[in-house]
Every structure is written in C-alpha cells, then in structure tokens.
Amino acid sequence: MKTKILFFLFFSTFSFSIFAAPITIAIDPGHGGKDPGAISRNLGIYEKNVTLSIAKELKALLDKDPHFRGVLTRKSDYYISVPERSEIARKFKANYLISIHADSSKSPDRRGASVWVLSNRRANDEMGQWLEDDEKRSELLGGAGKVLSHNNDKYLDQTVLDLQFGHSQRTGYVLGEHILHHFAKVTTLSRSTPQHASLGVLRSPDIPSVLVETGFLSNSEEEKKLNSQTYRRRIAYMIYEGLVAFHSGKTNTLVKDNLVQNIKQNDIKKSGKNNRTSEQNINEDNIKDSGIRHIVKKGESLGSLSNKYHVKVSDIIKLNQLKRKTLWLNESIKIPDNVEIKNKSLTIKENDFHKKQNSLVNNTNKDLKKEKNTQTNNQKNIIPLYHKVTKNQTLYAISREYNIPVNILLSLNPHLKNGKVITGQKIKLREK
C-alpha cells in the first residue's frame, strides 16, 4: 500500500510541471533597494541594477516565446528578503527559478560566469524546517496532502519531501549545465560545471532553482561589458537559449533577437581577449590546435609558454586571437600543434620512449593492483564506516550524501524495515 501511495505522490508531484504549457520561469534579479550587492571599482556600477536589467531582457525574450512565461520577483529598485523571493515564485506557480547575480572578488584578476545549485546539506536542513511547518508542508504537497492526511506516518512525509528535493537538485543541475554551455559562447567560465552551495534563494524543494553569476564586477574588463546594455542582452539571450535547449533538447530558439544575432559574431571577434572559451578553432594561418589548454600561473608569459611547449609566440597569439602580449592569471590558453618540432622531439627521444613503454608494459599488472588498493584505501578514508542519522533525515538523503545506492545500504543494514531510519540510529556504509 505504501509503495502505491509513494508512486501516486511522485507522479502527481512531478508530472504536471512536465505537461503544463507554457512553462513559467521565475526570474529573480539579485539584491535591490537598500541592498546594492557588489559595487564595481572603476565605474561604480551597482549589482542590483545590472541584475534587474538582465532580468527584464530575459523576461522580454521568454514572453515572445509561446512555450514560456516570464515573471519577475521584483520589477524595480526595491528590497525583497531571500525567503520572499521563493514565495513569490511559488505564488506565480513557477516551474523553475533563475536568480541573476554579478560576482565580485578581492582579486581584480578573477573573471568569468558560473552557475550554482542547492547543496545536499542545505537541502536536508530545509527539509527539516518544512516538516515542522504544517502549513508549508500542506502547501508543498498540494493535492497529495489529502492522501497523506489519512496516513499518520511522518516517514512518508519525509520520503515525499526527500524525493522532491532530490528531483529539484538534479533538474537544477542539468539546467545549469545547459546555461553554462551557452555562456561559453560569449564569455569566460570561472567554473565549467554547476557548483553546489548553501544559498537561501535555492531553497525551494518544489521549484528547481539555479543562481547565475554573470561575471565579475571587480574585473575591469567584465565591469565594462556588464555596463553595456548590448552585452546584458547577450547574457539574457544565452540564458534563454539554455532554457530552450533544456526544455526541448534543441537549440532552435523561436525568438530571434535581431540585435543579438547581428552583433554576435562581430562582438566575439572584437572581444576575443575576453572570450577564451569561444568555440572558434579555425584561423586564417591554418595553425593547428594541439588540444592542450594551459591555465596561466603567476609569473608566466608568452615566452615561457613558448619554451615549455616548443612553439612560436606568434602562433600562440594567432591561435588565441590575442590582441595583447601579456597573459592574465588563470587564463586558459590554447597551445598550437607544431608538427616539425614534434617530429624532431620524437626522433631524439624515441629510444627513451620505447624503454619506458616496455617498462610500463612489464609492470602493468603490478601497477593496476597497487592502484586498486590505493583506490580502496582512499574510498575508506572518504566514506566512514557508519553514519549517525540526524533529525528528519531519511535513507534517501543518506544515499545522496555518500553516493551509495539505497539497495546497497539495505543489504549492509538488514535490520532496517522498509528503509525506515530513526534519529540517532547508526547506519553501516561499507564493509571494513
């Protein structure tokens, strides 16, 4: 019976958002009013103004697409608390929430966009609060509340909430991947994958949410870009493209913003020094890309990279479309493929290479055995032998925290009945 109830709840909770049309996107411009957010160093730009501008551009794009509907958590310069932002999204019955921000750092060299999603720890904390609040729990479960009201089983409530948090986290992560993929067309990425964080605006278990950092206001070049209305529109368009790709699995957007489309290629060429992650690999001089990406460290220069990889400085400049001869810290540089030098180097070191190769072949089994033992030991160091159940925690939450399938946990703990755990209970996570 419990299995049937869980199936009904899972289906009723998640299915309606899939079939609903249009999809409602809650757009949350970070900060506002008395909270300016980050303030840029040179131009004195307020983050709250940048985020509101991008949010309005994104809403305009979504409203032109019949598959989407955009709603704003704030429409002008006024303050909204973090919890209120999620409540506003819920009031509009939003399917997804995108919170827009601009980053800042003490280091003026930090640059790039990133996407953040809810961490497991914050999800577990929030689930405990939702369970203790009867009104919130009833609001969250919606139609499923009638089913649960006849089952005095708190574990069932926990399981449903846990499923919702897990669904929101996974969905938010995939959405974040799509947005980052499109961001890479127009700007540097400070993080190549969505990052997990304990951020209040991502707290809704029923609304998959992502926080988008559009760049660093503390970086002089990104500051100038974010001060441009044209660039803000481009950022909004990349988020829109990410949503379309996430929703349909295609990048064929229905809305074609003429201004964005006309300037897209020209801007990428003009701002090549800012767009190291642009997908332009073809150049006029037919300089081949080796596929190597070098992250610039402190004190490194074009000359030192030239010596390290045995390539010409001019080739590095041309391949990366650099309009300067200085490198930025943490910048990603494409390394050219120099066939002549490569062949010469291979000829000189050919004998040494074969000796090393034979040595590696002879020791393969030994190395594999050592590696396997090392991995096993590392795993034991990372995963404790036991886990003590905290308040409102479920077996599903423990499974997510340690990335151990539920069926494995059940086999290690045969005393568990129907997967139910209680506060303070010790759960075995691995064999000794």
From Swiss-Prot:
Which class of enzymes does this protein belong to?
Answer: hydrolase
Tell me one GO biological process term. peptidoglycan catabolic process
EC code: 3.5.1.28
Keyword line: Cell wall biogenesis/degradation, Hydrolase, Periplasm, Repeat, Signal
Checking Gene3D superfamilies in the record gives: LysM domain, Zn-dependent exopeptidases
The terms describing its cellular component in GO are: outer membrane-bounded periplasmic space
Where does the UniProt entry say this protein principally localizes? periplasm
Superkingdom, taxonomy of origin = Bacteria
MurNAc-LAA domain sequence ranges: 25-244
Q: Where in the cell is it found?
A: Periplasm
Q: Name one Pfam family in it.
A: Amidase_3
Cross-referenced InterPro entries: LysM_dom, LysM_dom_sf, MurNAc-LAA_cat, N-acetylmuramoyl_amidase_3
Catalytic activity, as annotated: Hydrolyzes the link between N-acetylmuramoyl residues and L-amino acid residues in certain cell-wall glycopeptides
**Could you tell me which CDD domains the record lists for this protein?**
LysM (cd00118), MurNAc-LAA (cd02696)
- GO molecular-function annotation terms? N-acetylmuramoyl-L-alanine amidase activity
Check the UniProt entry and state the signal peptide residues, or none.
1-20
Record remark: domains? LysM domains are thought to be involved in peptidoglycan binding.
Q: What does this protein do?
A: Cell-wall hydrolase involved in septum cleavage during cell division.
Q: Which family does it belong to?
A: Belongs to the N-acetylmuramoyl-L-alanine amidase 3 family.
Any idea what this protein is called? Probable N-acetylmuramoyl-L-alanine amidase AmiB
